[in-house]
């Protein structure tokens, strides 16, 4: 984990309902003089970008959106965003189970939550699990006690530490760590209502 500043709060739900997004990969493409391409994958993690447009009362825009923007100092601090159709390790929106995803072993007894897309697809590191939703299994048996979840890093600690040969799986609901990727323009529509311009958010792979 990095030392970048992060606000442990979520973008308001009304904003999430109006968001569109896409996932992109860091691929460096170089073309030779003969027109041949050479492609290099910089890292294997998808980076999600959200585009949000918000029309509400002026009070809601100021109290919810602009207040978060100023608390974050624009692009400086990250915060949580829940994608409306991708917030669970069980499919996209299912109730998480202890058998959803393999956990990556970091050290003795410490594991990282992940979500793998497809049977051989890319993996998204889950840094921001939702509190109280993580369940874990060891060798196909649910671990009922001795599990501690750090909801700011997505790291799971199991005590006593499992053997290195044990298969550890888990599941949870999760938020995506993001930051603002531009300024916020506000246009008054009436004495009581206003709308924002396009609000760009970008996922953080080192929150």
Language-model-detected regions and their locations in the chain:
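Secondary-structure transition/turn motif
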Residues: 56, 115-119, 157-164, 205
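A surface-exposed beta-strand-loop module
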Residues: 141-166
């Amino acid at each position: 984990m990095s030392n970048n500043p992060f606000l442990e709060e979520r973008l308001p739900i009304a904003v999430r309902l109006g968001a569109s997004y896409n996932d992109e990969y860091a691929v460096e493409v170089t073309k030779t003089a003969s027109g041949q391409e050479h492609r290099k994958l910089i890292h294997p993690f998808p980076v999600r970008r959200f585009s949000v447009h918000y029309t509400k009362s002026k009070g809601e825009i100021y109290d919810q959106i602009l207040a978060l923007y100023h608390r974050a100092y624009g692009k400086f601090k990250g915060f949580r965003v829940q994608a409306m159709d991708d917030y669970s390790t069980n499919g996209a929106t299912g109730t998480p189970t202890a058998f959803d995803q393999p956990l990556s072993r970091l050290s003795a007894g410490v594991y990282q939550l992940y979500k793998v897309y497809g049977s051989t697809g890319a993996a998204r590191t889950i840094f921001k699990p939702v509190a109280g939703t993580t369940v874990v299994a060891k060798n196909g048996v649910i671990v009922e006690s001795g599990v501690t979840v750090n909801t700011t890093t997505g790291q799971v600690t199991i005590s006593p530490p499992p053997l290195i040969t044990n298969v550890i799986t888990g599941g949870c609901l999760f938020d995506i760590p993001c930051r603002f990727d531009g300024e916020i323009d506000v246009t008054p529509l009436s004495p009581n209502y206003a709308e924002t311009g396009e609000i760009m958010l970008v996922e953080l792979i080192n929150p």
